[in-house]
Amino acid sequence: MGHGRRISESIKKQLPVTGPEAPTVKNLMDWYLNNTNTHGCRRIAVSRGYLRRWIWICFTVSSVGMIFWQWTLLLMSYYTVSVSVTVQFQTLPFPAVTICNINPYRKNATSALLEELDKQTKLILKELYTSCTGCSNRKLRSVLLNEAPEEDSGVAKLLQDMPLMKFEVIKEDHVIVSELSSNRQYRINNTFITRMYNNMDLATVGEQVGFKICDANKSNCIIYTFNSGVTAILEWYRLNYLNIMAQIPNEKKLEMGYSADDLIVTCMYDGQSCDSRNFTLFQHPLHGNCYTFNSGDDGNILQTLTGGSEYGLKLTLYLENDDYNPYLFTSMGAKIIVHDQTEYPLVDDVGLEIQTATETLIGLQVTTSAKLSKPYSDCTMDGSDVLEQNLYNTSYSLQICLHSCFQTEMISNCGCAYYEQPLPSGAEYCYYEKYPGWIYCYYQLQDKFVNERLACQDICKETCNSKDWDLTKSLARWPSVASKDWVLNLLNWERGLNNTLNKNDLASIAIFYQDLNLRSLSESPANSIATLLSNMGGQLGLWMSCSIVCFLEMWEVFLVDILTIIARYWLHRGRQWWRKRKERQMQQPSPPDHDTGHHNPVCIDDEDPPTFHTAMQLPCVQTGPVPSTPPPQYNALRIQSVFDEQVSDTEVN
């Protein structure tokens, strides 16, 4: 007890509560502010001037407020142990579904246009049947020629200039080729082989089938050979077909194609009936009249409330097997593409083929992707920063950009547009009568495009935001053996076909959401600005006990104070220079006035020797400094000495 009393008395003695030596709150705050390690509080005490002091007070109070706010959030998050579960039933927009018949036009509508082409194709096939049975696999090649044989004038010009050929005799230094339509033969010398498009060794050339194409001047020609006669004929027929269709106006092609009522037999959506009025026409260059369900052109997009095969879109298509062109496509059925309402249906790129006599179930799962743009990736948000015109007038995509770029290069290099892609304003599609070298130019450009020697792959970018549908396809025979008779009889009666309908003319399709889960893939930066500042602040606090207030102190000292000192120094130097300049101007004498001559009657400078005239003039006033007169030296008069001497003389006398 005595020891505690002694400590209490010592404290009262050293820290009196009353009296003149008792500390006040102001003294305590001054001591704290001058000795604390809290940077902002110390700056309040040592700052000079009320403005700086109030600025530091505001910074410090704001920092304290941020600390308490963050602490409150952290404590609330730490002590919150409740769990909430939210269940929502959402609807998903049903995608647009575009349906095309693989066969683009009715056979009776194109028979007159394709008569000569079909005739030549049959003759070529007959020749191949008798001479090319059992052909082995071959590689894709092309051979450069510089001369062509004489052509018959009884066939179309393109069929003359682009004949199908077969390699006959192979020697060490040349190859003999024959035209399948005319049986004419000519040889390709080894000198021409060295200039070929993709060089090939003559020793490896077997019996090949290909066709010849030339430029507009026929100075350079190429024979393309294929690994199969079927592939060669399909490609040769397709080029001739495109050449013919490029000259047909869209109005006539619309009449030649299938109508929505011809193509669509039955339609159901979410258990409700639909018909051709719910479809929008879409003209495709290769597949003719296509039709889009839920296109959104009227401003309404259908929503799906329930997933499963019992819902969604169900269709029965009539594809008319006997109406197919046997040389244009070797497959039969329909092409379907699922896409967003703002996207262009690229049928040939991502279209799904549906076969006849089959029920096809297509389950959908939608996934949205969001990628980070620069500097994390070189993607584009909407294509506005891509230096390529969108010829499809739809939302941007990488494929749309590549096709548009190729069409632009085609017009720039070949002078005309490729038929399978949109036609830009002011251009026209290529056809042989007006552009005889377009096929040669197209293959040259296609080779550059495939080998990425065009600028398209550098110009076009991927999209940052995209929506993709994952398709799950399942097949079943349709109609079944048990239901075949009544289904076909009923459809024959509805369409008035007099029992000519068979199951190979029909295809059943069901497109539905497997579930209504929307999958989202998004990118986030691994190191954000907040993470960077947090890590840097942690290192500064760990090793230097520094915070953002330290940077404010540095900003005040090294920026504000140093700039103030520098400005004050140069201002002082400027004032000194100006003061010295004024002093030099005040000390500098004024220049003398030297007005002389006969016109000056007042004064004239001295002449040597003087004349009478100058002697009568006044001398010029001296403008220089007047010499000072020294004070008289009175002792030089020696008056007293003179008087003394006189007195002395008198006295002597």
UniProtKB/Swiss-Prot annotation:
- UniProt key word Transmembrane helix: yes
Pfam families, per database record: ASC
**Regulation affecting activity:** Originally identified and characterized by its inhibition by the diuretic drug amiloride.
The protein's predominant localisation is: membrane
Residue ranges for the region (Disordered) are 582-608
Q: Name one GO cellular component term.
A: sodium channel complex
Citing just one GO molecular function, the answer is: ligand-gated sodium channel activity
The entry's keywords? Cell membrane, Disulfide bond, Ion channel, Ion transport, Membrane, Sodium, Sodium channel, Sodium transport, Transmembrane, Transmembrane helix, Transport
Its placement in the membrane is given as: Multi-pass membrane protein
Gene3D superfamilies with a match to the protein in the record:
Acid-sensing ion channels like domains, YojJ-like
Localization recorded for this chain is:
Apical cell membrane
Q: Which cysteines are joined by disulfide bonds?
A: C100-C290, C214-C221, C267-C274, C379-C464, C401-C460, C405-C456, C414-C441, C416-C430
**InterPro entries registered for this protein in UniProt:** ENaC, ENaC_chordates, ENaC_CS
One of the protein's GO biological processes: sodium ion transmembrane transport
Cytoplasmic compartment spans: 1-54, 568-653
Catalytic activity field: Na(+)(in) = Na(+)(out)
Q: What does this protein do?
A: This is one of the three pore-forming subunits of the heterotrimeric epithelial sodium channel (ENaC), a critical regulator of sodium balance and fluid homeostasis. ENaC operates in epithelial tissues, where it mediates the electrodiffusion of sodium ions from extracellular fluid through the apical membrane of cells, with water following osmotically.
Self-association and partners: Component of the heterotrimeric epithelial sodium channel (ENaC) composed of an alpha/SCNN1A, a beta/SCNN1B and a gamma/SCNN1G subunit.
| Similarity section | Belongs to the amiloride-sensitive sodium channel (TC 1.A.6) family. SCNN1G subfamily.
Name the record gives this protein: Epithelial sodium channel subunit gamma
Q: Which organism is it from?
A: Neoceratodus forsteri (Australian lungfish)
Q: What is the lineage of its organism?
A: Eukaryota, Metazoa, Chordata, Craniata, Vertebrata
Q: Which gene encodes it?
A: scnn1g
